[in-house]
Amino acid sequence: MALVVKDDVKISEFINLSAAEKFLPAVMTSVKTVRISKVDKVIAMENDSLSDVNLLKGVKLVKDGYVCLAGLVVSGEWNLPDNCRGGVSVCLVDKRMQRDDEATLGSYRTSAAKKRFAFKLIPNYSITTADAERKVWQVLVNIRGVAMEKGFCPLSLEFVSVCIVHKSNIKLGLREKITSVSEGGPVELTEAVVDEFIESVPMADRLRKFRNQSKKGSNKYVGKRNDNKGLNKEGKLFDKVRIGQNSESSDAESSSF
């Protein structure tokens, strides 16, 4: 018996397109393509498993662009007799994220007595085409209380996604507001809701710290004389120039963005 999503996947359940995005040519809008992926399947053979899942199967991506995982429909079927005990937890995972709570995009729990089930998730975030090609999503399956011999398959899952493929994120910049401008310094843009510890540190300071750390220990001197003097092309003496942390800090302070 093949697994199917009972109802057609409706784009309107996940995406609200404007009139311009619906009717104007793709080159005139920020939305390049709205697509529904082909079905990808995960066969759960073990009680605990973490498997790669291709949520963009059959989706044509844009080179150097982005893809937004707008929505996801998951359907499952227990390959068991009726009225079996036990259940399962299914969790979608972004394997790029190192913190466990940030890597989990959504979860669903159901009992084995419910032979067929389906649920929707709305991740609604974008990744680059380069990341998407590396198949960054996984599914964590945790089966409990099902008494079946090892090597057999108690559960099958299928995944279909609704995604937006686009070339540029420039439209998102229209939501930004200027929150602070210091005389002689760079203009910094930020969203309205930002963690305080992030907002309190100017980007220039972070850049300076990063560059200093990456260049630490790379001090060099120009010239071969031992009296802190060097010769230019005309044979005149000049002071040696030290290239290191001090000169880089000065450059960072005078840069404008």
UniProtKB/Swiss-Prot annotation:
Question: How far does the signal peptide extend, from start to end residue?
Answer: none
What Gene Ontology cellular-component terms does the record carry?
host cell cytoplasm; host cell plasmodesma; host cytoskeleton
Q: Which ranges are annotated Basic and acidic residues under compositional bias?
A: 224-242
Taxonomically, the superkingdom here is Viruses
One term of GO molecular function: RNA binding
Residue ranges annotated as compositionally biased, kind Low complexity, are 247-257
Q: Where is this region: Disordered?
A: 212-257
Q: Which Pfam families match?
A: MP
Note whether Transport occurs among the keywords.
Answer: yes
Q: What InterPro entries is this protein classified in? A: TMV_movement, Viral_movement
Keywords for the protein's UniProt record, in alphabetical order: Host cell junction, Host cytoplasm, Host cytoskeleton, RNA-binding, Transport, Viral movement protein
Concerning its family, UniProt says: Belongs to the tobamovirus movement protein family.
What is this protein's function per UniProt? Transports viral genome to neighboring plant cells directly through plasmosdesmata, without any budding. The movement protein allows efficient cell to cell propagation, by bypassing the host cell wall barrier. Forms a ribonucleoprotein complex with viral RNA. Binds microtubules and modulates microtubule stability. Can bind double-stranded DNA.
User: Mind telling me what this protein is named?
Assistant: Movement protein
The source organism is Pepper mild mottle virus (strain Spain)
